[in-house]
């Protein structure tokens, strides 16, 4: 039977959660026979506990499950990359090994994509914890069709207006993805924009489905936050990798230079400041932010003329791109502006 949707699941030491994840997939109303599940063991180091769990899943549904073992830990981005050659479904999606999807997720996504001939379908998720608490993440409030042959609409998607650039809240048409050929960076924890953002330059039709089809589990483990802060450099680094990819595609870089300038400057500089506002080293890390600033000024010397940036009204914040951030006091002042703006 031809597979309708391939589901890619990166796995690392996930024996405690993969069963719930698998149960949510095998109970899909579209039928397990219509699905292809690609489980990628990202060099788990738990004495084969994860590998054995994945092997049991494969043995229970050999016609629908593929397991792949990686000898080197490349983190989620690299594990997803490893799955791409194995995709046979007309569409594919990502699920993390500690998350679940709603029983009718695949059915709704498949028929929505088919009816609209969509390159991507975007949908909502629910944040959950293991105490039974849940909070819906409201991004999409109504069903919409984005016709990206309309260049004005495309430019809005490149600014992130009302969209996300995460990878697991989307369904992708496989043929479309392969025509673009974007990929995830390896060995980083903030990997998704390098894969997702390029797709918006080439998609012709995107469906927005305002339903909560994905359950994202929040873990009350402070080490997760600590680890993210230890790897604070991943956030701007991935944006600079994305910039390098975009510059090689001169057609889109030239045509959408204004949108790209806004996105990279905002994401690499402002978002990094926001994401690290609880960093215990926040007041002494000014060389890190000066490094980001110096790259942005070199790449976008005319950023201050960008009409998207000018229209935001954060002139005091963006003014810090014009001067070196060389003291602890300068960074403190910049952070106070970020807090004042409620960013």
Q: What residue spans do the PLM features occupy?
A:
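Catalytic core of nucleotide-sugar-dependent glycosyltransferases
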Residues: 211-220, 226-253, 271-300
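Cell-envelope/extracellular polymer assembly enzymes that use nucleotide-activated donors
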Residues: 3-6, 24, 36, 194
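Donor-binding/catalytic cores of nucleotide-activated saccharide
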Residues: 97-207, 217-230
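Acidic donor-binding segment of Leloir-type glycosyltransferases
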Residues: 22-69
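A conserved hydrophobic helix/loop-capping motif in glycosyltransferases and polysaccharide synthases
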Residues: 5-17, 21, 28, 40-42
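Glycine-rich, basic loop-to-helix element that forms the pyrophosphate-binding segment
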Residues: 69-87
């Amino acid at each position: 039977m031809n597979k309708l949707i391939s589901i890619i699941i990166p796995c690392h030491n996930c024996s405690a959660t993969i069963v719930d994840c698998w149960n949510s997939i095998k109970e899909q109303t579209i039928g397990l026979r219509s699905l292809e599940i690609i489980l990628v063991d990202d060099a788990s180091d738990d004495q084969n506990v994860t590998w054995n769990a994945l092997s049991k899943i494969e043995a229970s549904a050999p016609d629908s499950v593929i397991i792949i073992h990686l000898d080197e830990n490349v983190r989620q981005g690299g594990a997803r990359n490893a799955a791409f050659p194995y995709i046979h479904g007309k569409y594919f999606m990502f699920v993390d090994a500690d998350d679940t999807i709603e029983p009718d997720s695949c059915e709704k996504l498949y028929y929505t994509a088919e009816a609209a001939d969509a390159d991507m379908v975007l949908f909502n998720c629910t944040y959950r914890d293991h105490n039974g608490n849940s909070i819906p993440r409201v991004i999409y409030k109504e069903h919409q069709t984005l016709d990206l042959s309309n260049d004005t609409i495309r430019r809005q998607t490149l600014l992130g207006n009302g969209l996300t650039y995460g990878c697991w809240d989307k369904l992708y048409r496989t043929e479309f993805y392969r025509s673009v050929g974007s990929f995830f960076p390896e060995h980083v924890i903030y990997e998704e924009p390098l894969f997702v953002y390029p797709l918006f330059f080439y998609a012709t039709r995107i469906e927005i489905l305002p339903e909560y089809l994905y359950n994202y589990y929040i873990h009350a483990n402070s080490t997760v936050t600590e680890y993210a802060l230890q790897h604070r450099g991943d956030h701007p680094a991935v944006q600079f990798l994305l910039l390098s990819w975009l510059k090689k595609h001169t057609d889109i870089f030239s045509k959408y230079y204004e949108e790209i300038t806004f996105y990279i400057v905002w994401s690499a500089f402002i978002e990094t400041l926001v994401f690290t506002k609880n960093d215990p080293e926040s007041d002494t890390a000014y060389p890190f932010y000066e490094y980001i600033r110096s790259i942005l000024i070199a790449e976008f010397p005319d950023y201050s003329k960008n009409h998207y940036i000018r229209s935001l009204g954060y002139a005091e914040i963006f003014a810090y791109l014009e001067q070196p951030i060389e003291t602890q006091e300068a960074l403190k002042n910049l952070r106070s502006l970020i807090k004042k703006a409620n960013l």
